[in-house]
Amino acid sequence: MIHIETSEYHWNGPIQNLPGFDKKYKNIVDYILTITDEIWEQKDISLIYDTYDENIIIHHGAAITKGVQTVIDGTIKMLASFPDRKMHGEAVIWSADERGHFYSSHRIASTATNKGDTAFGKATGKQIFFRTIADCAIANNEIYEEWLVRDNLAIVEQLGFDPVEMAKRNRDYSGKKSLAYGVRPRQLNGHQSQYDQSKDEELILSLFLHAWKARSEEERCRHYAPDSIIHAIQNKDHTAAANASFVLSLLNSFPDAVITVERLTSNKGKNRTEVAARWLLTGTHGGSGFFAGASGVPVMAIGISHFIIKGGLITEEWTILDAFDVLCQIHADTGGDIPLTESEMSVE
């Protein structure tokens, strides 16, 4: 089922009713931006206990981790590896339901210097830039479920490591080649509100369910304004035509790929609509394309995309999927020694 919710956009907007939340938060966007700043920029790790559910479920890559201690451990390790990390909140697209539960999709651009050791090796001293999109389900001042997608391929490459060799060292998926099919629960916890989609949501559904399915560059380009720009993984910016070629290359790596749109959330402004789409790719690594060298391994990848729509066409897009995690799945049984789901790679 695709869950679609539409809300007016609050950035520095009016005070919002937040049942069960700390009174210092003006609205749900303020909540997301404030706790991100206080935890990461001000390094107030203790705030995690107040803003994350004790039994939080976190989806990242093909893995699921549980418990607030996982968040704390990963945050401490990330800050040790990148102590000067700066996180710029580019957008928060949100919605709410009648129970007082909120859903947010937070796009973050980060700069950081690798001053401490990482799971991959010794500190490199290199400066990096990467994007993350975190979808959160929130109630009573606590995030209780999170879908985290970070451009880890960009991080590994900028640090100077070989992504394939590093993927072979990941031990988390060893012996779990069936992980992509059936192990991972796909039910959304608590998100029951569903609204009739507007033309803007229909445009995004059409992009994924028709243009991607047809694997047609021409059909995909019809959804975009002529001067549109797409911010893709590996810190690459594409035109609509160039991005259509990239998507085709991605899909060619999985000839039987199935794309499922799990959730759409939109915020309407005066002259534009911002839409967040969380989607799932499942398929067998069996072609050429972006992930060359067919292995026959079943793979899954969570993707999150943000769109700006004006005049019925996409003018700007940000799409993140963890291509490094896909490499880890492809090379799952190569005798890895790095526990990435327990490392700094498992948090925002």
Predicted regions and their residues:
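C-terminal and inter-domain tail/linker signature
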Residues: 1-348
